[in-house]
Swiss-Prot record:
Cofactor(s) this protein cannot do without: Mn(2+)
Family: Belongs to the glycosyltransferase 2 family. GalNAc-T subfamily.
Official protein name in the record: Polypeptide N-acetylgalactosaminyltransferase 3
Function in brief: Catalyzes the initial reaction in O-linked oligosaccharide biosynthesis, the transfer of an N-acetyl-D-galactosamine residue to a serine or threonine residue on the protein receptor. It can both act as a peptide transferase that transfers GalNAc onto unmodified peptide substrates, and as a glycopeptide transferase that requires the prior addition of a GalNAc on a peptide before adding additional GalNAc moieties. Prefers EA2 as substrate. Has weak activity toward Muc5AC-3, -13 and -3/13 substrates.
Main location, first listed in the record: Golgi
UniProt: Mn(2+) binding residues: 243, 245, 380
E.C. designation(s): 2.4.1.41
Origin organism lineage: Eukaryota, Metazoa, Ecdysozoa, Arthropoda, Hexapoda
Chain spans, region Catalytic subdomain A: 149-259
Disruption outcome: Mutant larval wing disks show a decrease in thickness and in the content of O-glycoproteins specifically along the basal surface of the columnar epithelial cells. Adult mutants display blistered wings. Mutant larval shows down-regulation of synaptic O-linked glycosylation, integrin level and signaling via Ten-m and if. Synapses show smaller synaptic boutons, expanded activity-dependent postsynaptic pockets which affect synaptic plasticity and synaptic strength in both the pre-synaptic and post-synaptic assembly, no differences in neuromuscular junction morphology.
Keyword Glycoprotein attributed: yes
Length: 667
């Protein structure tokens, strides 16, 4: 009996201890939470930035944001939206280093992240005049610019922008621009409702070293109308447009103005560096790149093997601008008079999105140029989502804007955009009134879109009259489509020319309607990326899967007359020798290794293929190996996946049989 009593006593004491410990930890948590809300950052010890790591990519301090059902942070109040939490700490974020928010402030950091879709607490710890490194190359630093450069008006549109971010943009413009070149700064408020952007902002800009004026839209109108208001009131020779969440680095302005002085018909863009939305670190991007648009007219960056060109002449000078088929649209400079001569903006475009597409096409097709200056670096806060809303919804606004741009400037290719862009249909062109913009195109005597593709963007991945566009189908010999295709190809006359893509295109087009009618989306298998979630610009293995409907681009390809098999976002079917480094990288990505990949398009023989209409085999031009569908084991995931490889050709092998189903892309 005594033994049992002793055991019960020990259990009771253990229970009391655990209860006391749980209460103690709960009390500590409550105190930390209260301190995070009431305590200021001014007394916090300046956190030491993480040590530098050797990597191909600059380090980035990742913040995990809550994603799930319910709102663990509570609803945002009017005070939350209107409060200005700017409390800079000397040296924080210096030289573009990341900001480390103290652990006690992490809850508050997550809560206020939602206001602007970036880490507001990190931004509010950084002084407005934080130091940045000189991101220019040695050649750019040594470059001398002529005297008598034109003056500029810097136009910044904002809507409910964070105080610290907006003012850091303005401060960087003032501190890193030669005073005699900076005519003024024009701020355009697109109907902000946050109190600190009213009288407080007006009082602040009155004492700036550069004349700064604020214009306010009477109602929420979007980027294009707001920029037009700023341009109408500008006095500088050049209009320089910046977003409200930027930081200009040393020497950013002179290269832009110098290029416009050389040619007033040039729209010149800076290199856009990355400011992290998580920790506001500043990361330099590489200079040798250019921009264009994918099949849905979304802007994309591509690494460049394009020749540097100035006024159409090739250049080996690394400081000369790079001609770019398209521009991102947020940051650029243009001669003020030329801006209006070329039709400024399409004033019927709402909010933002599509205006950069329209301007890129218009400038090139109507006699101007769009370029990127490698000597001008401006940082930009890139967000994973937008904090803004707009009547009608952003998706509807964007599709309307794209429909306007495509209808006016893309000729036959407008139908391709409307057929294969989500939210658009062929009827979209009838819903937009573009009479004035069409008249502008006629008045400026602009060139056709085919000229733009052939001369400005010859490496494009869009369909064209001399290209195949459609699906690549695996001819398993069982489906009706596979049997009909094989029968048609085997009965063709003059098969000695069968390895010429041009001949294949002609024969396929002659049976286009018949072949399209035969394809069975439930049974036929089409060539496609192995992983749907792999970025299209990175290495991705290739497989076959259920053929998708016409509106999806996952299994649609363009084939050029020289044998390049391309798909959306400038990705090409590529033969790669199995080098150890590539295999290791693919395994680290949980990828199945293969010697056939989807990779960024390049002008080399690894991406050139031939087709034999007699045997229905696709072979790599140099190695003479044929595309083959095989089962491969993913050792990391421990599962078998079907992948496309290049193997010795065997005309009897059913896994090497491929056909082409054309799809419509123009009227």
């Amino acid at each position: 009996m005594g033994l049992r009593f002793q055991q019960l006593k020990k259990l009771w004491l253990l229970y009391l201890f655990l209860l006391f410990f749980a209460f103690f930890m709960f009390a500590i948590s409550i105190n930390l939470y209260v301190a995070s809300i009431q305590g200021g950052d001014a007394e916090m010890r300046h956190p030491k930035p993480p040590p530098k790591r050797r990597s191909l990519w600059p380090h980035k301090n990742i913040v995990a944001h809550y994603i799930g059902k319910g709102d663990i942070f509570g609803n945002m109040t009017a005070d939350d939206y209107n409060i200005n939490l700017f409390q800079p700490i000397n040296g924080e974020g210096a030289d573009g280093r990341p900001v480390v928010v103290p652990p006690r402030d992490r809850f508050r950091m997550q809560r206020f992240f939602r206001l602007n879709s970036f880490n507001l607490l990190a931004s509010d710890r950084i002084p407005l005049n934080r130091t940045l490194k000189d991101y220019r190359t040695p050649e750019c630093r040594d470059k001398k610019y002529a005297s008598g450069l034109p003056s500029t008006s810097v136009i910044i549109v904002f809507h409910n922008e964070a105080w610290s971010v907006l003012l850091r943009t303005i401060t960087s413009v003032i501190n890193r621009s030669p005073r005699h070149l900076l005519k003024e700064i024009i701020l355009v408020d697109d109907a902000s409702d946050r109190s600190y952007l009213k009288r407080q902002l007006e009082s602040y800009v009155k004492v700036l070293a550069v004349p700064t004026r604020i214009f306010r839209m009477k109602k929420r109108s979007g980027l294009v109308p707001a920029r037009l208001l700023g341009a109408e009131n500008a006095r500088g020779d050049v209009l320089t447009f910046l977003d409200a969440h930027c930081e200009c680095s040393r020497g950013w302005l002179e290269p832009l103005l110098s290029r416009i002085k050389e040619s007033r018909k040039v729209v010149i863009c800076p290199v856009i560096d990355i400011i992290s939305d998580d920790n506001f670190s500043y990361t330099k991007t590489f200079e040798n790149h250019w921009g264009a648009f994918n099949w849905q007219l979304s802007f994309r960056w591509f690494s460049s093997d394009r020749k540097r060109q100035t006024a159409g002449n090739s250049s080996k000078d690394s400081t000369d601008p790079i001609a770019t088929p398209g521009m991102a649209g947020g940051l650029f400079a243009i001669d003020r008079k030329y801006f209006y001569e070329m039709g400024s903006y399409d004033s019927n475009m709402r909010v933002w999105g599509g205006e950069n597409v329209e301007m890129s096409f218009r400038i090139w097709q109507c006699g101007g140029r769009v370029e990127i200056s490698p000597c001008s670096h401006v940082g930009h806060v890139f967000r994973s989502s937008t904090p803004y809303t707009f009547p009608g919804g952003m998706s509807e606004v964007l599709t309307d804007n794209l429909a306007r741009a495509a209808t006016v400037w893309m000729d036959d290719w407008q139908y391709f955009i409307m057929l294969y862009t989500s939210g658009l249909t062929l009827g979209a062109k009838d819903k937009v009134n573009v009479t004035e913009r069409v008249a502008l195109r006629e008045r400026l005597q602009c060139k056709p879109f085919s000229w733009y593709l052939e001369n400005i963007w010859p490496e494009h991945f869009f369909p064209a009259p001399d290209r195949f566009f459609g699906k690549i189908i695996w001819l398993d010999g069982e489906t009706e489509c596979a049997q009909a295709y094989s029968k048609h190809m085997k009965n063709l006359p003059g098969r000695a020319l069968s390895r010429e893509w041009k001949r294949a295109f002609e024969e396929i087009d002659s049976k286009a309607e018949e072949l399209m009618a035969l394809i069975d989306l439930e049974r036929d298998k089409c060539l496609r990326p192995l992983k749907e979630d792999v970025p299209r610009s990175s290495l991705s293995a290739v497989t076959v899967g259920d053929c998708t409907s016409h509106a999806q681009s996952m299994d649609m390809f363009v084939i050029t007359p020289k044998g390049q098999i391309m798909t959306n976002d400038n990705v090409c079917l590529t033969y790669r020798q199995q080098k150890l480094g590539v295999i290791k990288m693919l395994k680290n990505r949980n990828a199945t290794t293969s010697n056939v990949m989807l990779a960024q398009c390049a002008s080399d023989s690894s991406q050139l293929w031939t087709y034999d209409m007699d045997t229905q085999q696709i072979s790599h031009r140099d190695t003479k190996l044929c595309l083959t569908l095989k089962a491969a084991t993913n050792s990391r995931l421990q599962k078998v996946e079907k992948v496309v490889l290049s193997m010795e050709c065997d005309f009897k092998d059913i896994t090497q049989k491929w056909g082409f189903i054309p799809l419509p892309w123009r009227m």
